[in-house]
């Protein structure tokens, strides 16, 4: 039905909002005015998942790649209009390192066309009354640097990353006021170098025979160490050279599950803390406190790189805000010590995490089966961040739910996503609870703006507020959730 398409969106907002609210059972009185006046609402994306114009072949489900993705590179003006239609305050996106520095290094030259694309995008976002939130690195290390010295396994990456970051600060920082150095380094390091299920696909042979080499007991920690040092060096550069005149903020985006003890025992309570330390504290403890969590140091010993006194001083306090990505909560249960000759990041945690206890899920299991819909977990993670990390400024930079890419489903049915409306409404209510309990949360970004390339799952998952028809020239359609959020964010006219 053509009237459900993007072009006619404004004409049917009231009807579909009414239908969506009725279907979801959400509280219509809960809206943007339930939050502090300066609270920022937005949605997010990532360069490789959206832009297209990538050339590397895929080695993931269905053989999918990001070569075309959502073709955001050519359609960004149309897409920024969609953001405006949803009354968003901000748009979160990442900058492709290779699009700016094709050879990965400053000496290899700056791609002026890449710089022009991001300048045009930033200008368009601002022209529509929104704020750009920019991630400098979202998992797309230039292949040239992987081939040259092994990417983040080498300390050489620090200088090249900071050179890339400086190009971004210099070219875009007069308009960009929110920078995140890295997105989810936990995912990049643990799954790229520990399990091999994400790029770069490295792991020990006893973890997976499909990995292209690696050491799951050491490489995740080495790569993470270089990420943290690169982050701190870039923050220092920004603070000393650009922040005094550009007046922006800089931080990092971490991801964490929330964890609940499987049994009410001291052992399982300890494993909850250990799980948080190995996932969340791995990055935030150094950045806030100057060193890795004691649980990591005590177990890993020499496998965990050490900060020099000078490095620790540089890393400590290297943030203006913390971005928090949250998707699920698990039960955590203690397990026996792992075999000393089959160590890996996963076995180092010494935990069994599951969404089920006595056959019952902790929350409804989602289409993405590793995720369980448990909104209180977001509140608990925010409260924990307040307690452990000195009540920092926080932006919830990702939170979302998917449905499957059912090609046999008529588009008119595929646009009915009441589950997403309920998901965001309930999670926002728990964010609101956290704020009322003193957590310094300043914003909330849905994942994601449009259905996109979801890394290892390719195009099987649809997380977007906007439906992408991959069988019809990537045509955009509003899902019901996009109308709901437009209504939720609608400003009063005085």
UniProtKB/Swiss-Prot annotation:
As given in the record, the signal peptide range reads: 1-28
Which Gene Ontology BP terms does the record give?
carbohydrate metabolic process
User: Do the record's keywords include Disulfide bond?
Assistant: yes
Positions with a binding annotation for a beta-D-glucoside = 49, 138, 183-184, 327, 398, 447, 454-455, 463
Instruction: Cite the entry's keywords alphabetically.
Output: Disulfide bond, Glycoprotein, Glycosidase, Hydrolase, Signal
EC assignment: the record states 3.2.1.21
The domain of life is Eukaryota
InterPro entries for this protein: Glyco_hydro_1, Glyco_hydro_1_AS, Glyco_hydro_1_N_CS, Glycoside_hydrolase_SF
Q: What top-tier enzyme class does this entry carry? A: hydrolase
Q: Give the family this protein belongs to, as stated in its UniProt record.
A: Belongs to the glycosyl hydrolase 1 family.
Protein name from the UniProt record: Beta-glucosidase 29
Naturally occurring in which organism (per UniProt): Oryza sativa subsp. japonica (Rice)
Which gene name belongs to this protein?
Answer: BGLU29
């Amino acid at each position: 039905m053509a009237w459900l398409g993007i072009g006619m969106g404004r004409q049917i907002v009231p009807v579909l909002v009414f239908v969506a609210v009725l279907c979801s059972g959400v509280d219509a009185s809960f809206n943007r005015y339930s939050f502090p006046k300066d609270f920022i609402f937005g949605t997010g994306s990532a360069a490789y998942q959206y832009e297209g114009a990538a050339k590397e072949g895929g080695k993931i489900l269905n053989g999918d790649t990001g070569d075309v993705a959502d073709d955001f590179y050519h359609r960004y003006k149309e897409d920024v209009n969609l953001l405006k239609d949803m009354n968003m305050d901000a748009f979160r996106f990442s900058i492709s390192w290779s699009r700016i520095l094709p050879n990965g290094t400053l000496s290899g030259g700056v791609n002026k066309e890449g710089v022009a694309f991001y300048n045009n995008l930033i200008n368009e976002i601002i022209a529509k009354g929104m704020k750009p939130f920019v991630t400098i690195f979202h998992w797309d290390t230039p292949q040239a640097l992987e081939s040259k010295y092994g990417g983040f396994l080498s300390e050489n990456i620090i200088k090249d990353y900071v050179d890339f970051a400086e190009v971004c600060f210099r070219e875009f920082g007069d308009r960009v006021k929110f920078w995140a150095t890295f997105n989810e380094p936990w995912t990049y390091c643990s799954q790229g170098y520990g399990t091999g299920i994400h790029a770069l696909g490295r792991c020990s042979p006893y973890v997976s025979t499909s990995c292209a080499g690696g050491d799951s007991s050491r490489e995740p920690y080495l790569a993470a160490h270089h990420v943290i040092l690169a982050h701190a060096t870039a923050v220092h550069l920004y603070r000393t050279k650009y922040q005094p005149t550009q007046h922006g903020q800089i931080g990092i985006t971490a991801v964490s599950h929330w964890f609940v003890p499987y049994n009410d025992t001291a052992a399982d309570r300890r494993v909850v803390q250990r799980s948080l330390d190995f996932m969340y504290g791995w990055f935030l403890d150094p950045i806030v406190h100057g060193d890795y969590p004691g649980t990591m140091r005590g177990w890993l010993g020499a496998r965990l790189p050490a900060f020099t006194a000078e490095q620790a001083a540089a890393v400590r306090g290297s943030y203006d805000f913390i971005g928090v990505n949250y998707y699920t909560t698990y039960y955590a249960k203690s397990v026996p010590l792992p075999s000393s000759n089959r160590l890996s990041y996963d076995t180092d945690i010494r935990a069994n995490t599951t969404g089920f206890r006595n056959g019952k899920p902790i929350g409804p299991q989602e289409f993405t089966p590793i995720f369980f819909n448990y909104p209180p977990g977001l509140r608990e993670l925010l409260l924990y961040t307040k307690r452990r990390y000195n009540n920092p400024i926080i932006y919830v930079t990702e939170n979302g739910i998917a449905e499957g890419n059912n090609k046999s489903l008529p588009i008119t049915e595929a646009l009915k996503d009441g589950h997403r409306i309920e998901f965001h409404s309930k999670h926002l209510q728990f964010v609101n609870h956290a704020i009322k309990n003193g957590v310094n949360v300043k914003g909330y970004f849905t994942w994601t703006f449009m259905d996109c390339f979801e890394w290892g799952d390719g195009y099987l998952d649809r997380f977007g507020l906007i439906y992408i028809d991959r069988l019809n020239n990537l045509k955009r359609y509003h899902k019901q959730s996009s109308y709901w959020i437009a209504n939720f964010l609608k400003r009063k006219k005085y």
